[in-house]
Each structure stands twice: as structure tokens, then as C-alpha cells.
Amino acid sequence: MNIHSRDVNETPDRSDAEQALAVLRRWAGEASETEVAQLDPAIARLLPGQELQNYPDLKRQYPDDFDANESYRATLPDLQNGPSSLIRGAKEQIQHVGISNFRLPIRFHTRDNGDLTLETSVTGTVSLDAEKKGINMSRIMRSFYKHAEKVFSFDVMEAALEDYLSDLESGDARLQMRFSFPVKVQSLRSGLSGYQYYDVALELVQMAGQRHRIVHLDYVYSSTCPCSLELSEHARQARGQLATPHSQRSVARISVQMEQDGGCLWFEDLIDHCRRAVPTETQVMVKREDEQAFAELNAANPIFVEDAARLFCEALQSDARVGDFRVVASHQESLHSHDAVSVLTQGTMFAAPSLDPQLFSTLIHRG
């Protein structure tokens, strides 16, 4: 007797479907709900007398009185701490993974005004080993909040970083705190005063067993073009023609690595270095006599973007508390439709063959 197997790709008729359903129901009658669900949760729809397990009658009111106790929490899934088999993509180490821009008020020590409470944007990241699926991001915030009531310094940042490394079982970590730092400044001649705000970031990095303390500061100043100044004077002297040199708002981002045993480098110290190097800082409160004084100050300190980088460099080199550093300057031209930029680094910390494509656009302060 010859038996011919039915082609599985052949379209079944109703009789075939009835036979298949009978077989399925006989199997399901002996199987558990878990076995049925593992095969296909939709099978429950075909079984007489059973509830639709994939369409439960869910509660729709928020349970205010529900207690997520310890035993309940132990049942919650934790995918980020799952096995390496859950990793998607290449099983490679990730140098930085964490959270950016969580904000809270933080108190800081200052050189001249005691302690200040400032709104601070915090970024915390850790390294992730190749065989680990991920990290629990909330642990970074919880670790940081343990120290949030303290008056912050690099020593407190060190303690927070230690908690990151311990809580997340990582080898490397980075903590950055970014804020706007107010300093009261005097006008040039009128005696008025107002607050100048400086974008400051503190960064603590542990990498390959080494720990680095870094301060970033944006300094905003006016730059008068030396060439334009001379051309304007030539027009006046040679032809009696009134002319004005072009000047523009300019920004330098100063990044310095602090020497471990060099003592405290205050925010105000770094600002003072910038003012001595390039004294044409933009003004806060201005009357006519201040505006005239600022014109005279710019004429006495004309500066190309190359000059700016070297003058800031000279000021930083004079401070034993400063190790490696980088100066990024941007003169946002009033003559040209492009900007003039320069980058000067000293040491290996900030040396890089590639620059962030958006680096110079971040130096445009929009308020």
C-alpha cells in the first residue's frame, strides 16, 4: 500500500481545518496553560470553555494604596542586568553610557562671595564591559543625590564618582556639572555695577586608573581687527575720510586640567587670567562715558584670533595650578559672513586629531 504525504504548501480545505482543530484541542486538553501560551497565546481563543488568556480583564483605576514591597520588587524584570545573550549588536565595550542634563540646585564654594546655590546640569556616565547588557540609569541619579546637599567641590565630586564606580560596578566614570556662574563687575568709568554670567563646567574623569580634574570656562569679549583699525586710520590721515574699524563679539572656551597637588583653582582665578590676557570683556552696565571708554579700550587692544589664543595660553602658562589646557577661540565676524577660529592645546589631555563638527557653533551665545 502506497501512502502519499500531503504537500504542506497545499491550500487546506474545511475538512482539513476541522481535523487540525480536533488534533489541537486534544493536545491542549492535556497541556498546561503555560505550554499553550508558549506555543501561541492565540490558541486559547480556539479552546471551548477557557478564558482568553491574552485578553485579560485588566483593572483601569490607578491603585493609590498598592505597596510595592520588597518581595514584590524582587519579581520585577530587570532587562539591563540580563545575560550577555540579550545584547544586541556587537559585544564591545562602551566607553560612556549614562544620563545627561538632569538638573538640581547645587551649592558651590566661591573665592569672593561665600557659597552660592546655582541651578546645575549634571551629566554622569560610566564604562560598560563588553559582556554586560546595560546599566540601571537611575542608580547614577540616586548615587549623585546622596551628595546633593553638600557644598560642592572637586572633593565631593570624587565621593560621588566613587559611588558610581561601586554601585554600577564599572572601571571608568565621568561626572560633569555645568552651570552659569555670576560675578558682579564694575563699569569702566560710571561706577555702575552689574552681574556678568560665565558658563562654567566642572568635569571629573576616571580613565584607565587615572583621575583628572578639569574646569571649562567660556569668556566673552570684543575683538577689534588690527588690520581694519590701521585701514581706518589710513583713510582718515590720507584722505580725511571718517572710517571705523570692525569689531565683534568673540568667545573663548578655556579648558584646563588641574594639577593634583597645585592647590585650588577658583572660578574667579580663571576669569582673572582671561581678563588680564584679553581685557576687552563685554560690559554689563553702560552709560555714555563707559561706551567711550570701551571704544578706547578696544583701540588699545586690537586682536586677531591667533593673538587671542596665544595671549590666553601665556596667562595659563603662568599658573602652576594649571596642567594641560586647551583654548578654543571664535571671533564672530562683523565684516565677513564667516567666523575666524583658532584652537591651541598644550599637553596630551586635549590634543585630538578630530574636532566635534559642532564645536564652534557651541561658542555662539544666544542667551
From Swiss-Prot:
* Residues at the site labelled May be catalytically important: C225
- Is Lyase one of the keywords UniProt gives this record? no
List UniProt keywords, sorted A-Z.
Hydrolase
**Mind telling me which InterPro entries this protein's record contains?**
GTP_cyclohydrolase_FolE2, GTP_cyclohydrolase_FolE2/MptA
One Pfam family name is: GCHY-1
Note whether Magnesium occurs among the keywords: no
Which reaction equations make up its catalytic activity?
GTP + H2O = 7,8-dihydroneopterin 3'-triphosphate + formate + H(+)
Q: In which pathway does it act?
A: Cofactor biosynthesis; 7,8-dihydroneopterin triphosphate biosynthesis; 7,8-dihydroneopterin triphosphate from GTP: step 1/1
Please list the GO biological process terms of this entry.
tetrahydrofolate biosynthetic process
Which Enzyme Commission numbers does its entry carry?
3.5.4.16
Segments crossing the lipid bilayer: none
The Swiss-Prot or TrEMBL record annotates one GO molecular function as:
GTP cyclohydrolase I activity
Q: What family is it from?
A: Belongs to the GTP cyclohydrolase IV family.
Question: What is the role of this chain?
Answer: Converts GTP to 7,8-dihydroneopterin triphosphate.
Name the record gives this protein: GTP cyclohydrolase FolE2
Organism expressing this protein natively: Ruegeria sp. (strain TM1040) (Silicibacter sp.)
This protein's encoding gene: folE2
